[in-house]
């Protein structure tokens, strides 16, 4: 990308890397997002230490959003304030602590252990479909776009007969290529489905996340909170994992000498997954942080109410982390990264994400040891309208 790219600086990418102008922006700099009446000025942090400081200090920085009447349906936004009740990223301690505690029954070690066989099954089902389709095939269509949604539906507790419809609603109301009106309509339908599902779970709690929270907290977990929990889980676990699968396979096929890491023991595979997560960093940035008071950050004077955007891809390529931080090396000791956030808002589903990715990559190369790009000369098309970075297509052969 170039400086002529109209997209906000913090989401610009070039191939598998953050854009050069993003990496060159400096530890903390002023950026303008939008134009005309919609233009907003923010601070943007790119240095790893600064990003950790901002995300880790809830005393000086808040995630509470500043709402605008235009955020109502029909304006520039999709989610209304009432629809973000239960979204942990929109709360600070102690309210955040109270809500996160309610959500933890859905992410216990026992729950993750129960999910493992299902994840392996769904991955192999999708690989079966790809194999039946024959070589070459689009790995995005058969695997990357299918596995995350199936895993999330199982986690949340969506009935199997409803899952295709549920994922269409989930994807549709986030699709920036659709009109605001269409996205809003899909969002309302998605919301109504969630409330109906929550009502069923209250009568007869299932084994999914909603059932686990209802069984533990009953009416102390409100319908609005449960809906917000579901929305956040789907936002965090769908496009992010889909993007990681597609980009991860592309990265490994460009570095075939490193694929053996997924043919060894579980520890080697997990180390490889963590390096891919750092190197690719598909989420652009977490919720902007709002300064609670005047303060100095990275030598800059930040005023109370100023917004700070943290660029996660840039932070994870900070040369301060390692002299060869721009090189993919899945055998190296893990480099500390912020792809899952930091502080009280560190991703609750990080263990599930790692398990899912490890299963996909391990099973893929176990079953398709000769996997390769169908046409190495073909240009790669990246997704630019989804909440996380990814690929629109990845044609592979075997």
UniProtKB/Swiss-Prot annotation:
Q: Which Gene3D superfamilies match?
A: Cytochrome P450
Q: In which pathway does it act?
A: Antibiotic biosynthesis; vancomycin biosynthesis
Q: Which SUPFAM superfamilies match?
A: Cytochrome P450
Q: Which UniProt keywords apply?
A: Heme, Iron, Metal-binding, Monooxygenase, Oxidoreductase
| GO biological-process terms attached to the record | vancomycin biosynthetic process
EC category: oxidoreductase
Essential cofactor(s): heme
Where along this sequence does the record place binding of heme?
347
The free-text function statement in the UniProt record for this protein reads: Involved in the coupling of aromatic side chains of the heptapeptide of vancomycin.
Q: Write out the similarity annotation.
A: Belongs to the cytochrome P450 family.
The name on file for this protein is Cytochrome P450 165B3
């Amino acid at each position: 990308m170039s400086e002529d790219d109209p997209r906000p600086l913090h989401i610009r990418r070039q191939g598998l890397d953050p854009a050069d102008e993003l990496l060159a922006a400096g530890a903390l700099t002023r950026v303008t997002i939008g134009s005309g009446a919609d233009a907003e000025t923010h601070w943007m942090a790119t240095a790893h230490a600064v990003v950790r400081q901002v995300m880790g200090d809830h005393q000086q920085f808040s995630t509470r959003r500043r709402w605008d009447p235009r955020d109502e349906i029909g304006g520039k936004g999709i989610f209304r304030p009432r629809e973000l009740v239960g979204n942990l990223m929109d709360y600070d301690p102690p309210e955040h602590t109270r809500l996160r505690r309610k959500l933890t029954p859905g992410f216990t070690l026992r729950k993750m252990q129960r999910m493992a066989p299902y994840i392996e099954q769904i991955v192999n089902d999708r690989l079966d479909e790809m194999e039946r389709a024959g070589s070459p095939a689009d790995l995005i269509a058969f695997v990357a776009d299918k596995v995350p949604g199936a895993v999330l539906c199982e986690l949340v507790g969506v009935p199997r007969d409803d899952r295709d419809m549920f994922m269409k609603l989930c994807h549709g109301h986030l699709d920036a290529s659709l009109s605001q009106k269409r996205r809003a309509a899909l969002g309302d339908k998605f919301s109504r489905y969630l409330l109906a599902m929550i009502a069923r779970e209250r009568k007869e709690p299932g084994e999914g996340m909603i059932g686990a929270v209802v069984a533990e907290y009953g009416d102390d977990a409100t319908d609005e909170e449960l809906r917000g929990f579901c929305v956040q889980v789907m936002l965090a676990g769908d496009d992010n994992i889909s993007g990681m699968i597609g980009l991860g396979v592309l990265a490994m096929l460009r570095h075939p000498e490193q694929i053996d890491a997924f043919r060894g023991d579980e520890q080697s595979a997990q180390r490889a997954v963590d390096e891919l997560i750092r190197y690719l960093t598909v989420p652009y940035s977490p919720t902007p942080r709002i300064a609670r008071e005047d303060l100095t950050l990275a030598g800059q004077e930040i005023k109370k109410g100023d917004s700070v955007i943290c660029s996660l891809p840039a932070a994870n390529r900070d040369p301060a982390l390692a002299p060869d931080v721009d090189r993919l090396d899945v055998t190296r000791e893990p480099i500390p990264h912020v792809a899952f956030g930091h502080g009280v808002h560190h991703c609750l589903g990080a263990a599930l994400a790692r398990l899912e990715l490890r299963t996909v990559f391990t099973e893929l190369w176990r079953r398709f040891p000769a996997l390769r790009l169908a046409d190495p000369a073909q240009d790669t098309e990246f997704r630019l309208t989804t909440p996380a970075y990814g690929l629109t297509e990845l044609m592979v052969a075997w």
